[in-house]
């Protein structure tokens, strides 16, 4: 059994979670799922109403609007040019 001093002196390295690491985890979890519902990092299940576009981006229908956003759903506003392939995935799965 450890003494209090031994227990409190042991530190476990904690990695810093950044937008880049979160994006890479989203990309890893959804690899090969372009055109299919995204996989949640929380519970590993498909997120209904979403379509994974690839490169860490997703689309979802919000009423009559299609929202394209970073898959990690950050609060930052971002702009990104999407490719014709992304538009084909959106048209096939959301329209």
Curated annotation (Swiss-Prot):
Q: Which GO terms describe its molecular function?
A: type IV site-specific deoxyribonuclease activity
Provide the leader sequence positions: none
Q: Which InterPro entries match?
A: Phage_T4_IpI, Phage_T4_IpI_C_sf
Q: Where is this site: Cleavage?
A: 19-20
Please report the propeptide residues according to the UniProt annotation.
1-19
What the protein does comes down to: Internal protein I is one of four proteins in a complex that functions in bacteriophage head maturation.
Output this protein's name: Internal protein I
């Amino acid at each position: 059994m450890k003494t209090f001093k031994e227990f409190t002196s042991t530190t476990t390295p904690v990695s810093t979670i950044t937008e880049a690491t979160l994006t890479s985890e989203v990309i890893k979890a959804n690899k090969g799922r372009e055109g299919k519902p995204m996989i949640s990092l929380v519970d590993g299940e498909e997120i209904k109403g979403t379509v994974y576009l690839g490169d860490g981006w997703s689309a979802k229908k919000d009423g009559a609007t299609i929202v394209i956003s970073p898959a990690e759903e950050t609060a930052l506003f971002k702009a990104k040019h999407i490719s014709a392939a992304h538009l084909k995935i959106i048209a096939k799965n959301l329209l």
